[in-house]
């Protein structure tokens, strides 16, 4: 598969260091460090790739628009030109973009509308696991979820994520429960831990990690009202 990887953020030397670390040597992978869209199309016409990857769309600019790369007008015009190229050539194009603090795709909404599929790759700074979610899929279901582990030699698929979530044996301990949950079409076994103690100060402290605090307070209110639990003076 002839792949053209367009890097607008990293130099060829940086990409070479990463390829050496991963022991990756593919003669069909072509690297182009360029941000000028017209030059990218020229090189693509010479290479004739089967797949093009652009990293990232916020760094690409076109001469048609007189504004800086990453602006709304530049992202909109570059995306439209890339869409036209993909349709005329039949070459799939993978656009890599940034997300804002709210978790949405940075830039104009038209970028999300013109593409066929939107995949969000997210991770946790404390763990080596990465989650790939399908936000939009014009030709399939969005109820898909992929879990990967970042290792020294690259990403590797996690075939049994429940085994990672249940790393310890807490049999016989109070306050620990294991339940089955579904994310998309994939079942998971997750572990929930709860700790209740008498409040030392006047106002009980309620905190949650990995769970919505407002939802937890609602569940506590249901337990208090309907199940007879006395949780008013409990942390």
Residue spans for each PLM region:
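Terminal-proximal interaction/regulatory segments of ATP-powered molecular machines
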Residues: 203-235
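Conserved P-loop NTPase
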Residues: 45-52, 58, 123-213
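Residue-level signature of catalytic and energy-coupling elements of molecular machines
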Residues: 15, 55, 97, 115, ...
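Conserved nucleotide-binding/hydrolysis micro-motifs of P-loop NTPases
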Residues: 9-13, 21-24, 35-39, 57-60, ...
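Conserved phosphate/pyrophosphate-binding and hydrolysis machinery centered on Walker-type P-loop NTPases
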Residues: 5-9, 34, 50, 68, ...
């Amino acid at each position: 598969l002839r792949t053209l990887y367009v890097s607008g953020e990293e130099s060829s030397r940086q990409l070479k260091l990463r390829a050496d670390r991963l022991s990756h040597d593919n003669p069909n992978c072509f690297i182009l460090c360029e941000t000028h869209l017209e030059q990218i199309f020229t090189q693509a016409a010479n290479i004739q790739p089967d797949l093009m990857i652009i990293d990232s769309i916020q760094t690409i600019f076109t001469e048609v628009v007189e504004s800086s790369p990453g602006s709304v007008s530049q992202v909109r015009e570059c995306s439209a030109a890339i869409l036209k190229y993909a349709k005329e050539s039949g070459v799939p194009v993978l656009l890599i973009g940034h997300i804002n603090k709210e978790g949405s795709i940075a830039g104009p909404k038209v970028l999300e509308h013109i593409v066929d599929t939107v995949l969000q790759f997210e991770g946790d700074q404390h763990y080596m696991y990465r989650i790939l979610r399908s936000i939009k899929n014009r030709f399939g279901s969005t109820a898909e979820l992929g879990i990967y582990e970042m290792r020294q030699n690259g990403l590797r698929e996690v075939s049994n994520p429940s085994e990672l979530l249940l790393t310890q044996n807490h049999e016989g301990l109070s306050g620990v429960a294991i339940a089955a949950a579904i994310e998309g079409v994939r079942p998971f076994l997750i572990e929930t831990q709860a700790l209740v103690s008498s409040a030392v100060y006047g106002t009980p402290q309620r905190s949650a990690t990995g769970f919505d605090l407002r939802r937890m307070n609602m569940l506590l209110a249901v337990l208090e009202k309907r199940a007879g639990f006395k949780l008013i003076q409990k942390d």
